[in-house]
Amino acid sequence: MFLSTFEKQLDSKRRIVVPQEFRAAVSGPFDGIFCFPSIEADCLEAGGKALFDRYQAVIEEMPFGDPTRTALETSILGGMAKLTFDTAGRITLPDHLCDMFGLTDSVAVVGMGERFQIWSREAFQAHRAQQRDLAREGLAALRAQQRAAKFAGGAA
């Protein structure tokens, strides 16, 4: 499981040290990660074989030729890079993926359970603030629904 947020440096060869905890989470026959442009945000998404298998299963449930399936195949499978760890625990991000999201020197590696994201530090700071606001609003709405359900159940 990928947890926490780490600030890392991207070197001149576009290498980044993947946190040890993240490397341990993807250990297996393939010593590396799958990385692709996120379809949810302006960042890279990455994970191990389990994440790849999950996306593949979602895609394969859709009929061949379905526009959504094609969009997912193009965005995820077509944009995916299979990156192996070097002896220092680094991966080398492809130029086109770095250029897509302005990844230059300082990046945030953000754990999200079964996956993680790689952001430019500045973009992540803005995104994190937006996500905190959405989380507060969502939690308040959920609590209101729970109170309403409890009240409705008690009134019967």
From Swiss-Prot:
One of its GO terms (biological process) is negative regulation of DNA-templated transcription initiation. It comes from the Bacteria. Residues 5-51, 80-123 form the SpoVT-AbrB domain. Keywords: Cytoplasm, DNA-binding, Repeat, Transcription, Transcription regulation. GO terms for cellular component: cytoplasm; nucleoid. PROSITE patterns: SPOVT_ABRB. PANTHER family: TRANSCRIPTIONAL REGULATOR MRAZ. Forms oligomers. This is Transcriptional regulator MraZ.
